[in-house]
Amino acid sequence: MKAFSCLLAVIATAASLFQHVDASHARDKLNNISRVERPVIHTPSRRVHAHSHFDLTFDLYPRRNRIKLQLEPNHDVLSHNARVTFLDTEGNVDRIERIERRDHSVFKGWAWTQAKSGVWERVGWARIIMHRDGEDPLFEGVFTVMHDHHQVIAKSKYVRKRHQQDPPLDNTPGEYMLLFRGSDIAQTQSTGNVERSIMSSPSCDADTLAYDSNSNFMFPPLPEENNTSIWNYFMTSIGKRQMTDTGGVVPGSRDLKETIGSTSGCPNTRKVALIGVVADCTYTNTFASEMDARADIISVVNAASVVYEHSFNISLTLGEINILPKNCPATASSATPFNQQCDDRAGGGSFTLADRLNTFSAWRGKKTDDFAFWTLMTDCTTENQVGLAWAAQLCVKGVQGNPDSRNSSSQAVAGANVVSKTDNTWQVFAHEAGHIFGAVHDCDSMLCQNPANPDNSRCCPATASTCDARGRFMMNPTSGSQITNFSPCSIGQICSRMARRTILTNCLTTNRGVDTISGQQCGNGIVEDGEDCDCGDEESCKGNTCCDPKTCKYTSGSQCDDANEECCKGCKFASSSTICRTSSGPCDPEEKCSGNSGDCPHDIHSKDGGTCGTDLQCASGQCTSRDLQCQMHLGNQVAGSRTVAFDSYGCEVACKDPDRPNVRYEGSLTFLDGTPCGGGGTCKNGQCSGSTFGNEVSDWVSRHKPIVIGVAVGAGCLLLLAIASCICGRSRRQRPRNRKMPPINMRPMAPAYNGWNGAPPNAQQSSPGGHPPYNNIPPPINAPPPAYPGHMPPTRYA
């Protein structure tokens, strides 16, 4: 019975949820760790500042490999208006400071290795933050060598986060740098994925089902009456981060395979995604100062941004940092309920990582900025989970739902995630951000063999014909080696979602006119005031004949820059007949160049609700319907092209087979924004918005006609019975009764007469008063009242 109850809980949960979360887990043990030896800053004074360009070399002990990092300032990691807000333990603003770019030596560049011949060969990218320069430099960051990421961390950080089975350190005093590779993490022989306890036999405990035990792979058909769950949104685990993650509207399996490697929909020119980060008390407490905490956040974003730049042409840029004091409050403030000491339900506590995400999401929902998303940095974990993220919430403002401390299943969904501090925090951050951009997990051996995922539609396959991606990419369900890029499938999925508008992109800005923290900096890839163009450093500008990388001015005769302006062809403005953005259908008209500018006009689409075909309407620039979206997303699991929407009311994708009209099929999906829903409203981020009470009543009546008819008939019958009862009662009260009247003792009157009948008898014997004499004879019992002359007609006697 217990197993049966558990199974029911799993099915009910999986079948009813439409928004969900992904959870990362900590890495497994390290097989090897190296010490960074002989670091040298190649400047005359061995000194650098925030705007320096320099080379940095060092050895990897004990391999003795010589590494060179060719570095330059990363100016676009901080926005011009970037600030840090210091909060007190109650969540009130203590002070606000501008983040000065000169205070943060943040660099980007390329990694090189030296061959035995002495020749340097470029082998990857590098992102570094310099803590100390001089003859004994100290830096942290990440670089890649042939797609294998190399993490450089300070000894103090390694000691604090060291796993029990990690290699021990010697007794060398002082602070120095350590390095480990992705390939140094313990791996299974079959797939190269990290071994974890979470990968053991799946557990099924209804009491802890809410988050990391959930799987949105389960889509069994359920009767409608059994398809109600207390959960409004779906949370799944990312590591084993967990089965999958697909929030919002996710393309079906055919779409995932068809878009592998496609960048159609992603920006052709650099875009900037502004983000906000909050450091809670547990995170701040791991650093010697608030300045160190700030530097670590900048380092994390600096490293993660490179993956998005290379894959999607989007830079992640810090707009605001909030830092809470290192001393955690005894009782969390209502202003910052997420700011609590570490607590774990599994260990008898009551505040999990999922609770932090819920309360943080509610906090983020009150912010009025235009940031792409917000991240909460913490030092807490739940068991071995180190990250959670809501799916497909890029650029989403506000919040759906509200966390209730009395109800563990209540959830608030917003553009937010939670990242725990680890020795590879940047990877967790990049992975969680990938879910906010709408990516599902890459397929691994477990997902490919899952019987509830027969067509591999809930994960990104390696190729159209191969399921298992073998743990090589950023959206792998578990941490693994050589993870430095998104898979071709993830790139295709995110780009296609941008093209189809199943994620918002309105918060992404162009690199033109974006102020950076350092003001005008030629070579940072952002076109600022006083610059015509900026193609980046000289390496990035190779082959660019339109822009001079040294002056950031157009070359002689150039009107625009092909690399940064969509309406620029051969350094000249494209003609007005040039299509700079193609149409994706009848609801998305093409845009053409103006002929006098290098910029493509804003992307516009037809108004939602407009007719675009038989039984089709425009929604988010697509010509579609509820039935068509059901066919696209769940058709291969239901009835193919015969699949139809279960009803016309909600915004979660619920479908049915016409042959089984009472069986409801659901997935972790929502209808496109602009799709009609109940009460005359339209779907917006998974919620029905704009409905009216009158229309909702009308819709409810139309959806429940049998009930309405039954109630009406029953009420009518009761009313008729009541009326009939009243009529019968009234009739009984008014019916005359045949009762004998008592004798009336009254003086008899002489019968009336009329002159036409002659004189009455004994007329000659009148009484002295002239009145006829009275007969002493009583009238009959039932005689009518006496008639009086002039009032009643005379009575005739026979």
Swiss-Prot record:
Keyword Endoplasmic reticulum: no
CDD domains: ZnMc_ADAM_fungal
Residues that hold Zn(2+) according to the record: 431, 435, 441
Biological process per Gene Ontology, one example term: proteolysis
Glycosylation sites noted in the Swiss-Prot or TrEMBL record: 32, 226-227, 313, 407
Signal sequence, renumbered to the chain: 1-23
Stretches the record annotates as Disordered: 734-798
Domain Disintegrin positions: 519-608
Free-text cofactor note: Binds 1 zinc ion per subunit.
Active site: 432
Gene Ontology CC annotation, any one: membrane
Membrane topology field: Single-pass type I membrane protein
Ranges of biased composition (kind: Pro residues): 775-792
InterPro entries associated with the record: ADAMTS_CR_2, Disintegrin_dom, Disintegrin_dom_sf, MetalloPept_cat_dom_sf, Peptidase_M12B, ZnMc_ADAM_fungal
GO molecular function: metal ion binding; metalloendopeptidase activity
Disulfide links within the chain: 395-495, 448-459, 580-600
The keyword Glycoprotein belongs to this UniProt entry's keyword annotation: yes
UniProt superkingdom: Eukaryota
UniProt topological domain (Cytoplasmic) ranges: 728-798
TM region positions: 707-727
Physiological role: Probable zinc protease.
Name used for this protein in its record: Disintegrin and metalloproteinase domain-containing protein B
Organism: Trichophyton verrucosum (strain HKI 0517)
